[in-house]
């Protein structure tokens, strides 16, 4: 029986959502287990974790400078303090296992757990592991990855754990018609969902303002989340009197309903987005972020190579590309069905269950090597 598990992951949805999905699976498997999420006071977790009914313990954010800067001089003191606070949480909740998902809080969690001999489980959501999980993977044989190419020795491929609501989403024709009606869309038209994350994406917004009329003329309707900062600008740029519905919103507060309404999506290719679209079998035209280490392109490649999506570089995204590549899919029920099946085939619906099993195995090693809790 699991008595107490600490899940460390914060800052971005790519760290927080997998942690919450595993917490949900752990709670379903053992309702008596104490589950504590370790994060920061300012990250996304500060809102999401309490809203999902879990205890949030916090540590200071400790960014790891990638090059010599004055901040590097302060790193040892900041890290020492974060490890001390993480350790205090592990002691307080009498943690049996620490599960880390990368990001700022995982390094102090891994170091504090190792000092106490608490087993560690590492989950890496991206094709290229970050610094935190490269460190954590050195301390444990219990390492889960989301892509076959992830270079962590001895890792088990599990995929990204997702909420049960995503895995059970109904995308039947009847559900699609109902979801479209909730957004004020035509229940029967082919529907393109456009979103660029919580803040939108400028290049996606720009191409939609130029392509909106051509798409509408071809019979395609659009559900478009432009981002709160860009909403007014996009609203002003969209043509008026379109011959098909165009529902523009600042953001989508119910992404699952949007997935149910859509036949295809135009979006960035963050790890969570790719995993969710694969889970629900929703084909996408992926537009990776044009900066960074190429991570978003790698995220989309398995689905694209399987035939479940399209890939276009940010600089190449324009109206001509959209009309030549996305429109023919949206207007062909046969192509949509094939892409949807191919997309769904790249998902990992058992990811959370696989990580729960890994957590149990890790806890068993602790019990065999050093009993922690006296019988009461």
Curated annotation (Swiss-Prot):
Entry's family note: Belongs to the glycosyltransferase 28 family. MurG subfamily.
Keywords: Cell cycle, Cell division, Cell membrane, Cell shape, Cell wall biogenesis/degradation, Glycosyltransferase, Membrane, Peptidoglycan synthesis, Transferase
Pfam family, one: Glyco_tran_28_C
Organism: Frankia alni (strain DSM 45986 / CECT 9034 / ACN14a)
Function according to Swiss-Prot or TrEMBL: Cell wall formation. Catalyzes the transfer of a GlcNAc subunit on undecaprenyl-pyrophosphoryl-MurNAc-pentapeptide (lipid intermediate I) to form undecaprenyl-pyrophosphoryl-MurNAc-(pentapeptide)GlcNAc (lipid intermediate II).
Residues where UDP-N-acetyl-alpha-D-glucosamine binds: 12-14, 126, 163, 198, 296
Membrane topology, record value: Peripheral membrane protein
Pathway terms, separated by semicolons: Cell wall biogenesis; peptidoglycan biosynthesis
GO cellular component: plasma membrane
Catalytic reaction list: di-trans,octa-cis-undecaprenyl diphospho-N-acetyl-alpha-D-muramoyl-L-alanyl-D-glutamyl-meso-2,6-diaminopimeloyl-D-alanyl-D-alanine + UDP-N-acetyl-alpha-D-glucosamine = di-trans,octa-cis-undecaprenyl diphospho-[N-acetyl-alpha-D-glucosaminyl-(1->4)]-N-acetyl-alpha-D-muramoyl-L-alanyl-D-glutamyl-meso-2,6-diaminopimeloyl-D-alanyl-D-alanine + UDP + H(+)
Root EC class: transferase
Coiled coil, from the record: none
GO terms of biological process kind: carbohydrate metabolic process; cell division; cell wall organization; lipid glycosylation; peptidoglycan biosynthetic process; regulation of cell shape
Protein name: UDP-N-acetylglucosamine--N-acetylmuramyl-(pentapeptide) pyrophosphoryl-undecaprenol N-acetylglucosamine transferase
Organism taxonomic ancestry: Bacteria, Bacillati, Actinomycetota, Actinomycetes, Frankiales
UniProt-recorded Gene Ontology molecular function terms: UDP-N-acetyl-D-glucosamine:N-acetylmuramoyl-L-alanyl-D-glutamyl-meso-2,6-diaminopimelyl-D-alanyl-D-alanine-diphosphoundecaprenol 4-beta-N-acetylglucosaminlytransferase activity; undecaprenyldiphospho-muramoylpentapeptide beta-N-acetylglucosaminyltransferase activity
